[in-house]
Every structure is written in C-alpha cells, then in structure tokens.
C-alpha cells in the first residue's frame, strides 16, 4: 500500500485533473476473478481509493490514472492504472475503484 497523487486522463492522453490524492493497494485474487481479467496476474490488480473526497471530475470505468510520484519498476516510466470495474462513490466522502496496472506502453 502506498499514498500518492494521480493524474486523471479520459480518453487516454487527455488530462482532466491532476494532483488527486489516492491510496493504492494490491487487490486479492478474488477481486481479479470477479473482474474476469483473463491472464492478469494478481499483482497487476489494485484498489485505488481517493483520500480527499470525490475529485472534481469523478472517476469512472475505463479512466486512466497516472501516478505522479511513483514509477513502474518494470519500465521506469510513471505507473499507469486502468479503472476496470464500476467505481463506488461513498456519500461524497471518497471513491473506490478496482484497477489493472498497465505494463509498458
């Protein structure tokens, strides 16, 4: 688990918001199965939680989240995550999104 900030892009390459404070933690194997991510390794699936309420541009399925502080250890580039499940919003308090880490590209 780590805390960082992410940039929200939709569609890929079009930044809509930067500096979204989030917590990123590894998802369980059951979470990956729930999404039916064929071929996804369990360590490529993560839960991302917003830490400072719901962003001005709320997260939604297929959004790309780019880590503004941490690099992907395999590529040396900023870590990138695709929102793959339905995003849950909790009374304007925060959002939770199941994401798959994008390797390379």
Can you say where each PLM-predicted feature lies in the sequence?
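Short, conserved turn/kink motifs that form compact alpha/beta structural patches or helix kinks used as
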Residues: 14-105
């Amino acid at each position: 688990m780590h805390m960082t900030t992410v940039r929200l892009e939709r569609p890929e390459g079009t930044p809509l918001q930067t500096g979204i404070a989030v917590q990123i933690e590894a998802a369980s194997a059951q979470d990956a199965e729930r999404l039916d991510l064929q071929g996804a390794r369990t360590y490529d699936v993560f839960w991302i939680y917003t830490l400072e309420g719901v962003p001005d541009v709320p997260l939604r399925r297929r959004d790309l989240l780019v880590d503004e502080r941490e690099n992907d250890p395999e590529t040396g580039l900023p870590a990138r995550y695709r929102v793959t499940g339905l995003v849950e919003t909790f009374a304007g308090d925060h959002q939770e999104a199941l994401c798959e880490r994008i390797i390379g590209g």
